A protein has these predicted regions:
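Generic detection of intrinsically disordered/low-complexity segments and helix-coil linkers/edges
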Residues: 9, 33, 38-40, 47, ...
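Surface-exposed, charged secondary-structure patches
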Residues: 52-116
Length: 147
């Protein structure tokens, strides 16, 4: 399958919606842990390969290069500093300034997401994606606050 910019944009939209879906399940007192696990399985290569993951809001344990550490970041867990990024008061997530590079097997996307609650948290993202059996998944994730 030849990956194109539309595929990458759809993946980014799916990732954003996945974060909001975790929040929705959490708000409705559902199994948000299962929802977050599905999100990671759908969007990251943790099950089959090594992944490099530098989340937005980390200070003590900067990198979360395993499934369990990533899960803790998104919903809270083993790591004291984790408050559950995906279960914050996000009402919407807007995309801006998306840049995509596709060269042979190399697929990289960089963009800005605005996480909206009572305030707006602007974050710059870079994903290095890899084609999995039938879809794209994240091999490298780096995100940082824009101040």
């Amino acid at each position: 399958m030849a990956i194109n910019e539309t595929d990458v944009k759809l993946f980014v939209d799916s990732w954003k919606q996945g974060v909001l879906d975790i929040k929705n399940v959490y708000d409705n007192k559902g199994d948000y842990q299962e929802q977050a696990s599905k999100f990671l399985e759908t969007h990251y290569l943790f099950e089959t390969e090594s992944v490099l993951f530098k989340p937005t809001l980390t200070r003590e344990e900067i990198f979360r290069n395993s499934f369990d550490r990533a899960l803790s970041y998104f919903i809270g867990g083993d790591i004291d500093e984790d408050k559950g990024f995906a279960i914050q008061e996000w009402k919407s997530i807007d995309t801006d300034q998306i840049n995509i590079l596709i060269e042979d097997e190399l697929i990289i996307a960089m963009w800005v997401l605005s996480f909206k609650s009572d305030e707006v948290l602007k974050v710059a993202f870079t994903f290095m994606l890899k084609e999995s059996s039938s879809d794209l998944k994240i091999k490298v994730h780096h995100s940082s606050l824009i101040k």
